[in-house]
Amino acid sequence: MNVTTTRKDLMIVNMGPHHPSMHGVLRLILTLDGEDVIDCEPILGYLHRGMEKIAENRTVIQYLPYVTRWDYLATMFTEAITVNGPEQLGNIQVPKRASYIRVIMLELSRIASHLLWLGPFMADIGAQTPFFYIFRERELVYDLFEAATGMRMMHNYFRIGGVAADLPYGWIDKCLDFCDYFLTAVSEYQKLITRNPIFLERVEGVGIIGPEEAINWGLSGPMLRASGIQWDLRKVDHYECYDELDWEIFWQKEGDSLARYLVRIGEMRESIKIIQQALEGIPGGPYENLETRCFARERDPEWNDFEYRFISKKPSPTFELPKQELYVRVEAPKGELGIFLIGDQSGFPWRWKIRPPGFINLQILPQLVKRMKLADIMTILGSIDIIMGEVDR
């Protein structure tokens, strides 16, 4: 009797672009030997919309609604970076009250982003309950956004020299109530998840990144801090009014998926601490710098020149970006979000290069999943936290 010989061929499998664990339209071409991953090739570009080229054909004010579509789960950060660049180029001072309002909005946005990372990450691993819990808290954050900005997601709230509107009456008390409630919710998550043996089995020691490796790959945000490096642009660059508030950089040294989970949970607690201090210490005064109106140009464009074709006969109020180049960055929930901006003495930027954290953090994925099991891909990709809107731009 002949024993049937088993085939030893490698198998090539497509994951995505329509896969629930891909967090958007990411496609992975996997080479498998049974359950073991031999190779992984990410295919990007399914959500490419030419955001950098669009920026060159818009004034900064016209471009503001577009930027909320990069990372559509943390839109305040994309708005912050879009107004910070022209503010630095034009030496525009932001009033203290506006700076405090910005910090409150940024940290609320960070919490909303981390919540919508936690739910799907747990669902990928096989825990369904936290997925429903996080929407309960995220809804409260969006209620606060809606009361202050009028929009739940694409806020369009930041303006050059300040913010679009002051905080409405009663909003500060409502936000303080949310902060008190949310700390108990985070404790509930930790009770539910952190010591769960099945969860620990799936994440402990999976996707380990050492500190030197993290720096060499250019990682940032929770990916970097989970590898033992205390680097946070809020402390390093001293932007807005973070220096006036008392908070700590949360970090872990293990570098695995569990460490990345713990860093994000810790960051949510620190964000609440920052928001509470900012709400209690928020000064009075204007919420925007009215001097920015002086930058409004009313000169008539020449017939058929570049600006004439885009802004039409009546120029919209904007200001010239001086002939300089500038790199601005903020600490977004996913890492360092930056733009490289070149002005050309016109209303349009000559070059607008986006440095998305998700795109750079994703580069290490093939190295992390090699020699791992197929099921670990969901864990590792989930712990990186990517949004394809900013990866593909």
From Swiss-Prot:
It is found in: Plastid, Chloroplast thylakoid membrane. GO terms for molecular function: NAD binding; oxidoreductase activity, acting on NAD(P)H, quinone or similar compound as acceptor; quinone binding. Gene3D superfamilies: Cytochrome-c3 Hydrogenase, chain B (1.10.645.10). Its main location: plastid. One of its GO terms (cellular component) is chloroplast thylakoid membrane. It catalyses: a plastoquinone + NADH + (n+1) H(+)(in) = a plastoquinol + NAD(+) + n H(+)(out); a plastoquinone + NADPH + (n+1) H(+)(in) = a plastoquinol + NADP(+) + n H(+)(out). Its EC number is 7.1.1.-. Keywords: Chloroplast, Membrane, NAD, NADP, Plastid, Plastoquinone, Quinone, Thylakoid, Translocase, Transport. Transmembrane segments: none annotated. It is a peripheral membrane protein. InterPro entries: NADH_Q_OxRdtase_suD (IPR001135), NADH_UbQ_OxRdtase_49kDa_CS (IPR014029), NDH1_su_D/H (IPR022885), NiFe-Hase_large (IPR029014). One of its GO terms (biological process) is photosynthesis, light reaction. It holds the Pfam family Complex1_49kDa. Belongs to the complex I 49 kDa subunit family. NDH is composed of at least 16 different subunits, 5 of which are encoded in the nucleus. NDH shuttles electrons from NAD(P)H:plastoquinone, via FMN and iron-sulfur (Fe-S) centers, to quinones in the photosynthetic chain and possibly in a chloroplast respiratory chain. The immediate electron acceptor for the enzyme in this species is believed to be plastoquinone. Couples the redox reaction to proton translocation, and thus conserves the redox energy in a proton gradient. This is NAD(P)H-quinone oxidoreductase subunit H, chloroplastic.
